From Swiss-Prot:
Swiss-Prot/TrEMBL keywords: Nickel
Family designation: Belongs to the LarC family.
Source organism (scientific name): Maridesulfovibrio salexigens (strain ATCC 14822 / DSM 2638 / NCIMB 8403 / VKM B-1763)
Protein name in the entry: Putative nickel insertion protein
UniProt lineage: Bacteria, Pseudomonadati, Thermodesulfobacteriota, Desulfovibrionia, Desulfovibrionales
Any one Pfam family match given in the protein's UniProt record, by short name: Ni_insertion
Listed Basic residues bias regions: 74-99
Molecular function (Gene Ontology), one example: lyase activity
Length: 417
């Protein structure tokens, strides 16, 4: 399996990601041609050059805005930190239009980009929109994009999607993401690093802080990673095929570079079939045994893989019951609704799991009492055990007026012959 491994020891910004993709082998001409499909060529030009930080050479990308050629990208200029999209800090001012999410959707959907690139680009923008909306108590279509709605950030995000699909890798892996430290100026004033949007986008993902007193991961970079990453590991076992460096604009105490590696991971292929599943759980302390039993029957009838109860003791020493339901990943929403409908719970925990299953087959066994269906468990093509179907055994016990245990005994004798 070929992967991209993002080594974010110095964080990530949108321009550094584009630079790393070009350094990895994406054709600059191809990228520029694809970006032209947005119809924004009168707003920007892409400057691609070679640069170095702390002796590490790589590719640098500058998105030069058509009306701002006088805005120089000097390494020492205090407005050009790794801090924000193209290493601009939050307080730089662009005079071009700051589009909102609806504007961006119309721009991308009306372009000639392929559908995969469109979908990925919009997914990244929606991650930013959701973060901004939560922070500002708004909706994704009402919230005002600041830097992320600017031309250079649109180029960063759509460019990232173009490069991702051009490389055709199997998965994207990532190290812990360095966020930096200190404070940064943004549209709402001076904010601690990470910026609120960055923090919201990366919620639940492994990060580090304090390598430098600058913003090292921007909202754009964070959203790109959050959309692409399949797995996090600081020390993956992999065979590196190629290493690329995207050069940042500021010269920090540590190399201001984004290292991205094309690598191969040996997959341990299991011959055992697995099923992506969900374990849904809730605790109930105000339903009778009869009501719980009826709920279990209903959930099983509706197609749950398994349902069981566990006795627990809750707060104030109240006896209660944990309902655990196993279902397929695609049926998660269906069974959450059924649990809410048929029980008194107000909340459900969902755990993503992978269920490993054996192949099964069925055959008929003739006994002195009658025919019984046998279920066979198969491992590596061989039957490792068999058991009679309960309902057949119950029917024979009732038919002959004998205990169920006697039916099982007779089946056992036949199988010994």
């Amino acid at each position: 399996m070929n992967i991209l491994y993002y080594d974010c020891f110095s964080g990530i910004s949108g321009d550094m990601n584009l630079a790393a993709m070009i350094d990895l082998g994406v054709s600059p001409d191809f990228l520029i041609t694809e970006l032209a499909k947005l119809g924004m060529e009168d707003e920007f030009s892409l400057k691609i050059s070679q640069d170095s930080r702390k002796g590490i050479f790589g590719t640098r990308v500058d998105v030069e805005l058509a009306h701002q050629h006088e805005h120089h990208h000097d390494h020492g200029h205090h407005h050009h930190g790794h801090g924000h999209h193209h290493d601009h800090t939050h307080d730089h001012h662009h005079h071009h239009e700051h589009r909102n999410l609806k504007d961006i959707e119309e721009l991308i959907n009306s372009s000639d980009l392929n559908d995969k690139v469109k979908a990925t680009s919009l997914a990244i923008f929606k991650r930013v929109a959701k973060a901004e909306a939560k922070i500002h108590g708004s909706t994704i279509y009402e919230v005002h994009f600041h830097e992320v709605g600017a031309t250079d950030s649109i180029v960063d995000i759509v460019g990232a999607a173009i490069c991702f699909h051009e490389l055709e890798i199997d998965q994207v892996w990532c190290s812990s993401i360095e966020l930096g430290g200190g404070f940064v100026n943004c549209a709402h004033g001076k904010m601690p690093v990470p910026a609120p949007a960055t923090s919201e986008i990366l919620a639940g993902l492994p990060t580090t802080q304090g390598a430098v007193q600058q913003e090292t991961t921007t909202p754009t970079g964070a959203a790109i990673l959050a959309e692409f990453i399949n797995n996090f590991s600081d020390s993956p076992r992999m065979t590196v095929l190629k290493t690329a460096y995207g050069i940042g604009h500021r010269d920090n105490e540590i190399p201001n570079v984004l290292r991205v590696q094309l690598a191969n991971i040996e997959q341990q292929v299991s011959s055992l079939p697995t099923v992506p599943s969900r374990l849904l759980q809730c605790n109930i302390d105000d339903m009778t045994g009869e009501m719980l039993g009826a709920a279990l029957d209903q959930l099983m009838e509706d197609g749950a893989m398994d349902v069981h109860f566990t006795s627990i003791v809750m707060k104030k020493n109240r006896p209660a019951t944990t309902l655990s339901l196993l279902c397929s990943a695609e049926d998660e929403d269906k069974f959450k609704r059924l649990i809410f409908k048929h029980t008194s719970t107000l909340g459900i925990k969902s755990i993503a799991i992978e269920k490993t299953v054996l192949d099964i087959s069925f055959d008929k066994l003739e006994t002195p009492l009658g025919t019984v269906t046998m279920k066979n468990a198969i491992l590596d093509g061989e039957v490792i055990r068999s058991k009679p179907e309960l309902e057949d055994c119950r029917a024979l016990a009732k038919q002959h007026g004998i205990p169920l245990s006697e039916v099982y005994l007779q089946i056992g004798k036949v199988r010994e012959i």
